[in-house]
């Protein structure tokens, strides 16, 4: 493919820019110390997509075993059993690469590996073990995960969403600023009710009040205030994985009556009502703590994750800065209606470039044209490992370079404006939103 001179010139500039990520699920250092190509794939989007059965976090005995818990699908990743016959293993790997090597997740993960480990060509059965060995050797250095993010990924900073341990900064507070997740508080009104990550506040915090709803809310408020005082920079909801993101107004009395009802005492409809109250309560807390509220939209429970379902909440809380994640994919054009009409909407293209690179290019073209301000567009990798994060950065930089080059060539703006916009998209917008001093 012949690349235009404009693309090559803008790409050279973009490739050297640092990034700030709005969203990571980066796994602890101890996990990375045992990393291989197989465990990397297991804890990646292609692993989720392929669907190897994984251990749930609540059943683990230590954080070095943390793995992404998702529903199993039909196809499995190649076996990582060292006792497997070499011929069988080679065949499994070849079939895996043939079946999934064209998927955007795999393409960008592989480009991340190439950038870090310097091998030429593509991953294949013949070089699988040697690349895996390189990964293992690199990660014997306990500093490797952050070194890779900073060196190959050009990361300045990242917002960390440790859904297995709310508010956790991975013991790297200078690099990771945590989110304050709301999911289990929205979903669980009793220890018999768990959110999609198998969490409940009544399990995570054994001393949490259960006899009085006011005391319960006070406990949560103090918990979030403490997180905020210790470096948390945003609130985060991924409840779209289990319910609609249309949150109706519910009065306090109704929610109080539903509080601490067990699974066999409460209907699904009443669980939604309770969650509606709690989510609205958190919107008020977000305003009080003066932090943005990150909202998962798209690609979850598809019937309930369309970004337009969230409009009433956006309108209800004009003082809350809502960060709409994932471009609302696959409804990335529809999210523009919200960005056009509401100045408290920040479009975050987190995850989108590795879901569909072509879709992300189309989306960014439109966002630049329609967003109320060029300051209201951002990005995050949304990955578990440094290797996949680097791939996600490369995908984002490709998308930005391609869009800016096409805008320049179309006469939409000139090269100097493109350079300014590139800096905003790479790090300045996120730095301003989360108040990082860069």
Predicted regions, residues:
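Generic structural signal for well-ordered alpha-helices
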Residues: 146, 220-224, 283, 310, ...
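Catalytic pocket-lining loop regions of alpha/beta-barrel enzymes
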Residues: 244, 258-380, 387-389, 429
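Mid-to-C-terminal alpha-helical segments outside catalytic/metal-binding sites
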Residues: 2-22, 29, 34-35, 41-116, ...
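Histidine-centered catalytic micro-motifs
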Residues: 19-29, 293-300
